[in-house]
């Protein structure tokens, strides 16, 4: 294979059979359960990279079912998101995500910089209860519950929150182990169509794990529980801060 062909075909590894396809990345019937809780502000400050700033001492714990996604297929995901501000702009910082599908795991890390690891998340309805769980290996590290479709949510407020920017810390090492890329990335979700949205009483339980430390942001008080289904497009990102050029 000629050098020019290598350059033209270079998108993802392996060169001749990339682990994930090019976008756009459209998600249909994407289902969320989000438990928002109050936590220790010092715990957030210990994991939040500058120049992001904590908006408030809360965390959104997410369980997500994605049954129909372009190129990525059918999978589930779970993790923690922190409300932040960046130079006066309000948004969200994804601290950690766990999922059960290789293409979005590789694509999420390599393209955007999502902090993804392999895990076993689930989001299921058990009679009148929506139940989310996350196992890391044989260990259950998160369990969330909420009533099933108790009260309709304000869709305009939900759409506004989904339109806010999201921030990621993308880190890729050089071949000698030194940092090659260390960037703050901003991305948006677009073309959002909400198909249903509800609130209900909710609960969240987190358990310590050495390699999946979701419990490092402890649950002090559950503030809200939201369940919604939507279609959306996951746009590619832009670099807003380069740590290696400062």
Curated annotation (Swiss-Prot):
Outcome of swapping residue 62 to Q: 20-fold decrease in kcat
UniProt-annotated site: Important for activity, residues: 117
Positions annotated as active site in the UniProt record: 116
E.C. designation(s): 4.1.1.4
Catalytic activity: acetoacetate + H(+) = acetone + CO2
Keywords, in A-Z order: Decarboxylase, Lyase, Schiff base
Superkingdom of the organism of origin: Bacteria
Database matches in InterPro entries: Acetoacetate_decarboxylase, Acetoacetate_decarboxylase_bac, ADC_dom_sf
EC class of the enzyme, as a word: lyase
Any one GO molecular-function label of the UniProt entry: acetoacetate decarboxylase activity
Record flagged with keyword DNA damage: no
Biological role stated in the UniProt entry: Catalyzes the conversion of acetoacetate to acetone and carbon dioxide.
Assigned protein family: Belongs to the ADC family.
Quaternary structure note: Homododecamer.
Protein name according to UniProt: Acetoacetate decarboxylase
Organism name: Chromobacterium violaceum (strain ATCC 12472 / DSM 30191 / JCM 1249 / CCUG 213 / NBRC 12614 / NCIMB 9131 / NCTC 9757 / MK)
């Amino acid at each position: 294979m000629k050098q020019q062909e290598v350059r033209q075909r270079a998108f993802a590894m392996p060169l001749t059979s990339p682990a994930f396809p090019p976008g756009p990345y459209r998600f249909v019937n994407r289902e969320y359960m989000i438990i928002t809780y109050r936590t220790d502000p010092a715990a957030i400050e210990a994991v939040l990279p500058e120049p992001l700033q904590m908006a408030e001492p809360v965390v959104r714990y997410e369980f997500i079912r994605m049954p129909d996604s372009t190129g990525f297929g059918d999978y589930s995901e779970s993790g923690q998101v922190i409300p932040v501000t960046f130079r006066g702009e309000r948004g969200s910082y994804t601290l950690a995500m766990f999922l059960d599908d290789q293409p979005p795991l590789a694509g999420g890390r390599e393209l955007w910089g999502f902090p993804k690891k392999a895990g076993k998340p689930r989001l299921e309805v058990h009679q009148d209860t929506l139940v989310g769980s996350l196992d890391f290996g044989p260990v259950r590290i998160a369990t969330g519950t909420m009533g099933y479709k108790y009260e309709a949510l304000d869709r305009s407020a939900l759409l506004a929150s989904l339109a806010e920017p999201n921030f990621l810390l993308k880190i890729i090492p050089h071949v000698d182990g030194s940092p090659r890329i260390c960037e703050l990335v901003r991305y948006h979700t677009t073309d959002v169509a909400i198909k249903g949205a509800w609130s209900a009483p909710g609960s969240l339980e987190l358990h310590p794990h050495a390699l999946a430390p979701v419990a490092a942001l402890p649950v002090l008080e559950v503030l809200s529980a939201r369940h919604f289904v939507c279609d959306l497009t996951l746009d590619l990102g832009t670099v807003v801060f380069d740590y290696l050029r400062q």
